[in-house]
Amino acid sequence: MKGLMGRKVGMTQIFNEDGIVTPVTVIEVAENVVTQIKSDETDGYNSVQVGYGEKKIKNTIKPLQGHFEKAGTTPKRTMKEFRVDSTEGFTAGQELKADLFQAGDKVDVTGISKGKGFQGVIKRHGQSRGPMAHGSRYHRRPGSMGASAYPGRVFKGKNLPGHMGNVQVTAQNLEIVRVDLEKNLLLIKGAVPGPKKGVLVIQTTVKQGK
């Protein structure tokens, strides 16, 4: 499994040779550095720990300062571990760039979705509204919530109004349309979670379908 962290730049569109337009999300994947190598011999499994984003030394706790110094790099704001079949080709302090992926690769993109605040059931869960006529008292309310005297309660998981968004979301099996090696950019087909400048995790998809 290959993986990088990046920052969402925004969306645009590109045209192929036949003039077909494809909406893409632009993700900048600069500043990825290997901070630790884990192997079967030392940890019982193979993985590569990657750090992303610069962080001031004064804001980094002493144990992590030593961790980054051992890897020969500066403190990083975010760290993520990617499981790999083999750690060959990876070394501590190595900088990972966009060439880790190629056009046509399928990836999963994970990010924190946009926060929407407190929302009702129509926006939050896609429920239908009631009649909007003058005589109706039921427009955008949740409606019936349960049964009668038995069980006499609302079941857990019932779709109700509440806080919407600001949770971790993964968009699966997205295609990388283009890789810009000069600017360290990945152009991924479609939309991905999160706002502009949001930190994303891009890794090989778990759905190895056709």
UniProtKB/Swiss-Prot annotation:
One function term, GO molecular function aspect: rRNA binding
Region described as Disordered: 123-144
Protein keywords: Ribonucleoprotein, Ribosomal protein, RNA-binding, rRNA-binding
Gene Ontology biological process terms, A to Z: translation
A UniProt-annotated Pfam family: Ribosomal_L3
InterPro entries: Ribosomal_uL3, Ribosomal_uL3_bac/org-type, Ribosomal_uL3_CS, Transl_B-barrel_sf
GO CC annotation: cytosolic large ribosomal subunit
Top-level taxon in the UniProt lineage: Bacteria
Protein role: One of the primary rRNA binding proteins, it binds directly near the 3'-end of the 23S rRNA, where it nucleates assembly of the 50S subunit.
Family: Belongs to the universal ribosomal protein uL3 family.
Subunit details: Part of the 50S ribosomal subunit. Forms a cluster with proteins L14 and L19.
Protein name: Large ribosomal subunit protein uL3
Native species: Alkaliphilus metalliredigens (strain QYMF)
Native organism taxonomy: Bacteria, Bacillati, Bacillota, Clostridia, Peptostreptococcales
